[in-house]
Amino acid sequence: MPSRRDFLKTASVATLSALAAREARLWAGENDEAGKARAGSQSGSQSEQKIVYPKATADTLILLWMAGGMAAPETFDPKRYQPFEEGLPVEKVMSTFPAIDTAVDNIKICAGLENIAQVMDRGTLIRSHVLPDLGHILHSRHQYHWHTGYVPPQTVAAPHIGAWIAKVLGARNAAIPAFIDVGQQLENNGEKEELKAFHTAGFFGSEFGPFALPFPDQAIDAVRPPKGMTPERFQARYQRYKELVKQSPLGQYGSAFQQESMLRSMENAHRLLSSPDAKAFDLSLEPKESFDKYNTGRFGQGCLLARRLTEAGARFIEVTTEYIPFVHWDTHENGHATTVDMKKEVDQPIAQLILDLEARGLLDRT
């Protein structure tokens, strides 16, 4: 006998197939006059009709990544409350945090996220998202799949979602990298190669790759020339570096596409280093009162940096709590206490980011 899940999968496939075969009015929308006209017309094949895409409603995307995976019943999907106690049998564990009200009637989340609860009316809560079973050994496999849409391993490097957005939409501000990755160290990590596998532009070329800033409070150091270096010397170094790239293995044996992409990425970096917009990376310029609202750790500072970069014209920013095996949200040990600490780190900064974007008129386009 098929299981409930098998039945739902079959029903979903059948429904999608039926929708895909519907009249041409779907191409332009149910209520679109042109779509209705096309639907009523018997002339012309469906293959000749132009797809009408919805208009973009956002300029910037900020992805806040809870690396390691927060437990849904302890955060945004509370179940029956069971107070935590040492030695609690696993079969009795439902939600060890009580449910609290939010700004939306009949929507509750778990205690410890009080600030986020007050801004829930600015967003959409999805509790039905399901991922494929890629094995339980490495979180990196699931992170790779979520960020790229591909199941690892791949014979070619698959682009990160940020690289797709950078490639398709391009930069909003020519001086600000289109894809900025905040908070994740790729070295000194037990799964560094797995992480590197999807923190990449893949087959799009290096110019669309992430501008990595593992430590938000040091971001400004990555976008300004070394102290004391004159503009003339900086320009001379840049020219010399381009010559060295030509003599490198990439320059000697890489394809023309790879070489040109590398040179364009260098040009982008040079443009940023000489731009006044680089001050957006300097958290020391943030007023103390504002900075303190975000200063819960690297993630909170990353949220502040994301807001400043959004104001400066960034296209895609990912801020992560950082994935390290068995640390942070990867709560294999002392799970309840660790979840308490992680909520303290993310609750205020996430809520403040939403409020700040709203106050600046940016929330509707972010």
Predicted features and spans:
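Ligand-binding pockets and gating/stacking loops
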Residues: 1-366
